[in-house]
Amino acid sequence: MEKQASLATGLHRLLQASLQAGEGWLPFDRFMALVLYAPGVGYYSQRSQPIGRMPSQGSDFVTAPLVSPWFGRTLAVAVQEAMQHAQTTTVLEFGAGDGSLAFQLLDALGDQVERYAIVEVSAHLREMQAKRLQGFSPKVQWLDALPEAIEAVVVGNEVLDAMPVKLLHRVNQTWHERGVIWEPNTGRYAWQDRPTEARPPVAIEGDHDYLCESPVQANAFMRTLAERLRRGAAFFIDYGFPAHEFYHPQRHMGTLMCHHHHRSDADPLTDIGAKDITAHVDFTGIALCAQEAGLTCLGYTSQAQFLLNCGLLRLLEDASPLERQQAMMLIQDHEMGELFKVLEIGRAHV
């Protein structure tokens, strides 16, 4: 408890300093970046085990590779094909979680992978990954950022949803950017909107109040990836929607979600630093951004259809009943099958 309190105090001091530098107002994307990624005090710096199947493990959320090892084994089919097209023996994973997906891909691809690079900002997660992947240690390398030149197949599972977003809020038909302030009278962080010229990429029908996210960092990431991807392709798996669903008039409260001990809420201004903050992905916007930066959209579908296309059912023929049951969670509509999507981008010649 003392460690948690000191970390919370450290994060609070950092937020207060940032608020002072910003004349008392902090854009939400900056707030989200500090809360999640500030060295030593952010969520991913101090949460020793954010990913796991059960709250009793101290985890906050579960990802597909932990639901079933057949996620990575099936994804390996598509990764292998992309590696052959790109004539590369390198896989680059961005944000590798606890290392489960890397283990599954390395195990399935075997000698076809000569180098497996991981871009990971969390020291805790690096330690978890190193322990899980020690059997593949000669191949595995950790990086602090994307390489200047990439000749590889890139994989990002639940990465885009954790990138900081701006919040756009339409009130009385006027658009504002939502930011964070500190209220000394209540001793709490609170919302404050400021007028902005920024707009969502599509017109929002109706004149009702409306809140949505603007994926500024994910778009910047796509532009950087486009600049540096010399040869190869990239697979991004995440929960989200195409633009017409993401900006649906009835989705007027946005998609921002927090996760703590496998429970979700929509208030990032409470339990700051103790819970994950995410936003669903506008896959249309991400694909368009990648295309405008010079990449080609090679495929987009639901996770269920993607895994079925890669031969999941055939791969499960010799699996145990329990393994089949777990794998079905990856493709069932009410589990991960439809909400999660897969986007593949790359160079046109791949």
Predicted features along the sequence, with ranges:
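A short SAM/SAH-binding and catalytic strip from SAM-dependent methyltransferases
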Residues: 149-172, 211-216, 220, 228-235
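Rossmann-like AdoMet
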Residues: 1-94, 98-150, 305-311, 329-347
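Short helix/loop capping segments that flank catalytic or ligand/cofactor-binding pockets
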Residues: 44-45, 163-165, 245
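A residue-level signal for conserved active-site and pocket-lining positions in enzyme catalytic cores
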Residues: 35, 154, 286
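Active-site flanking residues adjacent to catalytic metal/cofactor-binding acidic residues
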Residues: 92, 119, 154-157, 237
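Long, Lys/Arg- and hydrophobic-enriched amphipathic alpha-helices
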Residues: 200-347
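A mobile, often basic/glycine-rich helix-loop segment
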Residues: 155-202, 249-259
